[in-house]
Structure formats: C-alpha cells, structure tokens
C-alpha cells in the first residue's frame, strides 16, 4: 500500500488506526452512548443556551429512561416512526434517544418546511406521533396525528379547540414514574434508528435509513482523533440543525457518546454564537461554509473572548485554501479543519487530522478509520491512482441501509459490492488527503472541458470585496455551457462586473473564465449550508 493508502486493487484504505466496533450485535446506540457515563455522572452533558436548562450525564440518562417509558405508554413500539418537526433545543436529543431506546425510528423535518413539504414526508415515512413546538403547530394540525409539544409546562400552550391528542413534553415525562431502566425491547445494531431525508440535490428528497450500528460506527470515526490526542471533556456548540445528519450524528450523538458537553442553540445568529462561545467556554465549533465565510470576514468576531476555542471544523461543501487562510487571520490560534460526509454515510467519510497542525490546504482530510474509497473514472469506470479525478465511491460500517420505499434509488446508489456511489467528483493526493471538487451533476460542460463551480466560488469569496458567490452554467450555442456568477458584494463595496472578471481571468485557464457577473443580495442555500444552484439555474432559464 502506498503512503496515500492506495492499494494494488485500486482501493484507498484509511491511514488511521483500526476502528474497533462493539462485538455484541444487540448493542443499541443508547446503551452505547451511556456505556461509560457512570464514571462521569455529574459532568455537564447538555446545556440549552436559549432556555438556560442543563443536564448532567446522570440526569440525561434518567430523563431518557423516563421519556422512553412515556413514549412506550403512548403506544410507540419497535419500528414505529416518530417525526420531530422542531428547532434545536435540549429536548430534541432527549426525544431522539428515548424513541430509539425503545426500538422506534426517529425521523426529522426542517422547521422551515411548508405544510405541503411536511405532508410529503409524512406520507413517505408514516409516523405515529409528531413532536413539534407551539410556533409550528398550525403547519401540522391538519394531519390528525397525536402531537407532543416541546418546551416547559409554562411555555407550552395547548391550542384552544384542538383535539385531545395534544400533550406537552412534560406530560409525556409524567406518564412514567422516575425509572433507571428502559422498557425492554431487543434492539440489534442492524435495526433502523433514524430516517433522515437527504437534501435532494439530485432531485426529490429521499428517506435515508440509518441503523444503530451506523450511528455507533460514525461516532467512533468522528471522535477517534480526540482519543489519539488524549483530549477529554470538550464543549461543542451546536447551532447546526439537529434535523440534519451533521447536527444529529456528527455533533450531538458523536460527542455525547464520547462524554463531551453539548450546548444547543435554536438558530444561527453570529453575535449570539460568539457570545455563547465566550459564556460556555466552547472548545469545538462545527460549521458550514456560510458560517465559515462570516467568521472569516466579519469584524465583530474580534469583540469576543474566543480563547477557549481550539478547533473550527467545516463540512457540507468544499472550502478553498484562501478562505481558510483568511479565517485563520481573523481567528488566530484556532485549528481550522475540513471534513466530508453525507447523509448516506451517517455524516462522515473523511476529516483532517488535527495532529498534523495548521495546514489550511483546502483538503477534506484523510479517510476516517474503517472507511474504504475508490476514485472511479467517469469516462472509463476504472479505479484511479492518486492525483487523478473521478467519482468518489465509499464503503464502511457507517453506510446507510438504503432509501425508504425506494429500491430503485437504493440500487442506483449502492452497488453489489456495497460501494456507495456519492455523485461527487474528487481525488486523493499522494499523502492520502481527499479533495472534493464538486457534484458531478453540477459540473459546467464547456466545449468538452469540465468547469467546477465550487473552484470558481472559492476564488470569488477570497476577494475582500465579495461576501458570497455562486457560479452556474449558462446555455451557449457555440460552447454548450459557459460559467456565469452571482455575487454578493461586501458592505460599501463598489466592485464591478469587469473587476471581478479580470480577478478570475488572472487565476484560471481561459475556458474557466466568467462570461457574466450579476449582483444579488443573498445566495440561496439549504439548511445544511449547501448552495441551491438549481434554484438560480431555473430562475435564469425561465427568463430566457
């Protein structure tokens, strides 16, 4: 095997130590989370920055057991689906753990969804109960399903004239006496624990079935570097939505099972994030590119004491080297890292190794322990050696079971040898670092050349007068497609289209040059921070 991890069989293997998974097939993600908690019972587990509530690991374990009995009394049985439609709070992970402790399947929906969008997900996942909040009740009252409203007794208002199927979170807790054990349900690692809907960048949203074993494996992959560095009792701020795999698996579950503390935030607001880092002495911050941009470019960052912060990690979309260096200047003494994962891989494929120190290379790091990969040529279907691009295929114990009710999509994504075809274009360098170039379907085809929008976007946001940017294809009779950009100017900037075109032309081959630049106030993005290029493509084409 080369130092890149590339083998003679065309497979890249992780350069990290071997992943050790629990051997007992009857291990649930909940029993695994609390396996060591008796040695730190009074340590902070969860703090809710919005309400001031907090729980130690001992209190968390008791609350989850009691809530599990409550859901059991409400009739939730093994394989029953429970939908949560709510923003982050300390009660969100309690519900996740309580539902999965009794063999239920936890599915999540974006609080920004319309009635129509929630309706589609309810039709697909068939939940028995909806967990939500007062503010969103109007969107779910028409589904004729029992509802549990999160919040405290004082803040939950049971809407007048509504049916008797509405309970508060406290009501569910009170259905059971304080208990120390969960209702007995036999749970296997291969059982489905969560049904998370993929962002649908390739079309309609699909329900990704993730097992107890997937969560356990992914959590060990995510936290192995902490073991290697001898780091304990970190404090992780979670404003990334817990309805998404990044917030739920990579931050919430992975860190709690490691004995780290979690600080929840209901929504992202830069000043509030900075205040909470200072207040809770946060050590680790996982973000998505729009937040990374804000941390790089906003002067308000300098007004807060961020001395506790050791790491900022970013995922969801590739970040360029220039932007990482800019962020490093704005927040010195913090290690900046990137990772790569997707819902289908329980949030992790690769992550940079903090033991290597500051690099800001623009890479998504080395394969997580236990993960194998291939880079497969889009033209020939053959495995590619280092520094050759192709589609990223991955395999490992963190890969999904499949898509719910969609055998065709499952078959198209997972092949007979268990490789998950990611649809992402990338390559490994000679040191085994993965570089994610872009989504294959989003590449711009210019006279047979391929132009990656993410590469041009990375160059654009490296300019001090540019706050954000998106690049999309524009139909062209001669070339097929040409790259055009939509740019958000920095405050007080008067940068012009010509200035931007010249700035890019100096740095790229002629076929990658921008043919047009338009100015917009906001780049459309998903809750996970991914650019919604399709929306802009559709807008542009509808005006042609």
From Swiss-Prot:
A motif (Microbody targeting signal) lies at residues 542-544. CoA binds at residues 267, 447-448. It is found in: Peroxisome. One of its GO terms (cellular component) is peroxisome. Residues 269-338 are annotated as: SBD1. It catalyses: hexadecanoate + ATP + CoA = hexadecanoyl-CoA + AMP + diphosphate; (9Z)-octadecenoate + ATP + CoA = (9Z)-octadecenoyl-CoA + AMP + diphosphate; octadecanoate + ATP + CoA = octadecanoyl-CoA + AMP + diphosphate; tetradecanoate + ATP + CoA = tetradecanoyl-CoA + AMP + diphosphate. Its EC number is 6.2.1.-. Residues 339-403 are annotated as: SBD2. It holds the Pfam family AMP-binding_C. Induction: By methyl jasmonate. The keyword Acetylation does not apply. Disruption phenotype: No obvious phenotype in growth, root and flower development, fertility, reproduction and morphology. Keywords: ATP-binding, Fatty acid biosynthesis, Fatty acid metabolism, Ligase, Lipid biosynthesis, Lipid metabolism, Magnesium, Nucleotide-binding, Oxylipin biosynthesis, Peroxisome. GO terms for molecular function: ATP binding; fatty-acyl-CoA synthase activity; ligase activity. ATP binds at residues 198-202, 206, 338-339, 343, 424, 439, 530. Its cofactor is Mg(2+). SUPFAM superfamilies: Acetyl-CoA synthetase-like. GO terms for biological process: jasmonic acid biosynthetic process; oxylipin biosynthetic process. Expressed at low level in leaves. Both substrate-binding domains (SBD1 and SBD2) are involved in the substrate recognition, and are sufficient to confer the substrate specificity. Belongs to the ATP-dependent AMP-binding enzyme family. Contributes to jasmonic acid biosynthesis by initiating the beta-oxidative chain shortening of its precursors. Acts as a carboxylate--CoA ligase that can use various carboxylates as substrates. Follows a two-step reaction mechanism, wherein the carboxylate substrate first undergoes adenylation by ATP, followed by a thioesterification in the presence of CoA to yield the final CoA thioester. This is 4-coumarate--CoA ligase-like 7.
